[in-house]
UniProtKB/Swiss-Prot annotation:
Reactions catalysed, as given in the entry: 4-CDP-2-C-methyl-D-erythritol + ATP = 4-CDP-2-C-methyl-D-erythritol 2-phosphate + ADP + H(+)
Enzyme class: transferase
EC number(s) stated in the UniProt entry for this protein: 2.7.1.148
UniProt xrefs under Pfam families: GHMP_kinases_C (PF08544), GHMP_kinases_N (PF00288)
Active-site residues, record numbering mapped to chain: K12, D139
BP GO terms, sorted: isopentenyl diphosphate biosynthetic process, methylerythritol 4-phosphate pathway; terpenoid biosynthetic process
Keyword field: ATP-binding, Isoprene biosynthesis, Kinase, Nucleotide-binding, Transferase
Binding site for ATP: P97, I98, G99, A100, G101, L102, A103, G104, G105, S106, S107
Keyword DNA-binding: no
Pathway: Isoprenoid biosynthesis; isopentenyl diphosphate biosynthesis via DXP pathway; isopentenyl diphosphate from 1-deoxy-D-xylulose 5-phosphate: step 3/6
Family per similarity comment: Belongs to the GHMP kinase family. IspE subfamily.
UniProt gene name: ispE
Function: Catalyzes the phosphorylation of the position 2 hydroxy group of 4-diphosphocytidyl-2C-methyl-D-erythritol.
Name recorded for this polypeptide: 4-diphosphocytidyl-2-C-methyl-D-erythritol kinase
Length: 310
């Protein structure tokens, strides 16, 4: 077994989030495009001889117990391995804001699967890890694969698309005092839009095919930026002052191509032709964001999900 393993866990943004309808299992049928960005957490993992799994974190207030996806991922991987004596010391360095619609928790869980599969020498394939990830969270398989992906079903069914012609830049903002409940956001979507949901697999399949064929996606490029549809934004924004303010500030940034909320929010972002343009726009507006109570980051698209570090 390897002595120590370090893994990065990138955040994601939604370039497209379409709620197609309600499934018989209670979940929503989704058609999404997700993109990894270089705002990332880090996991440092080492073996323990006593068979315990212990998690620590540099983020005060974040639970390190068995409700944390890192702990749950570690426990599931050990259970499936059959080697119940395996133990690990895991330290999580948080950079992705919590409860932000950026899949920080899911990315950490995916990174734990990758890290401990390596640390413990288990030899699970990427597909096996993705199957375990899907048991833990709908967006965890994406967080393992990363890059840019079409995501269908609950979000766990991935299809690769051509890599972007260039790495677009991102300015990302979040008010650290505000969070949005994902179940609430989907419940509001059902309440306000449920009468217009598609109702059968034939209709779902047609919308998936429409998204696969979207000109802006083949490949993604600054000359034809994505429309950034987010059906959850339609219901969250009118009821969340933080999202309204974030989008107004982002829309005022010089050179931005498009703005949107990510996932169920409340994080919002603007796209730029490249990282330099994003850096320069944030430099101009950093004080305005701070005065309005927002944390802000400039980021780039990346072509990977959870990744082993040297």
């Amino acid at each position: 077994m390897t002595a120590t393993v370090r893994v990065t866990a990138p955040a994601k943004i939604n370039l497209h989030l379409e709620v197609l309808g309600q499934r018989s299992d209670g979940f929503h049928e989704l058609a999404m495009v997700m993109q990894s960005i270089d705002l990332a957490d880090q996991l440092d993992c080492s073996n323990r001889a006593d068979g315990l799994i212990q998690l620590s974190c540099d983020q005060p207030g974040l639970s390190c117990g068995n409700d944390n996806l890192v702990f749950r991922a570690a426990a599931l991987l050990r259970q499936r391995s059959g080697f119940h004596e395996l133990g690990a010391q895991i330290h999580l360095r948080k950079r992705i804001p919590i409860g932000a619609g950026l899949a920080g928790g899911s990315s950490d869980g995916a990174a734990a699967l990758l890290a401990l599969n390596t640390l413990w020498g288990l030899g699970h394939t990427h597909d096996h890890l993705c199957a375990m990830a899907a048991e833990l969270g709908s967006d965890m398989p994406f967080c393992l694969a990363g890059g840019i992906q079409l995501c269908f079903g609950r979000g766990e069914c991935l299809e690769s698309v051509p890599a972007a012609e260039q790495s677009l830049g991102v300015v990302l903002v979040k008010n650290p005092t505000v969070s949005v409940s994902t179940p609430w956001a989907y419940g509001e979507c059902r309440r306000l839009k449920g009468d217009h949901y598609l109702s059968d697999e034939v209709a779902f399949a047609q919308r998936r095919q429409d998204l696969r064929a979207a000109s802006w996606l083949n490949p993604l490029r600054a000359a034809e930026p994505p429309p950034l549809r987010n059906d959850l934004q339609d219901v969250v924004e009118p009821q969340t002052a933080s999202v309204q303010m974030a989008l107004r500030l982002l829309q005022d940034l010089p050179g931005q191509l498009r703005t949107a909320m990510s996932g169920s929010g409340p994080s919002c972002f603007a796209l730029f032709p490249n990282r330099l343009d994003a850096d320069q726009a944030l430099d101009v507006a950093r004080d305005s964001f701070a005065q309005a109570g927002f944390d802000a980051w400039s980021c780039s698209f990346v072509g990977h999900g959870a990744k082993l570090m040297p």
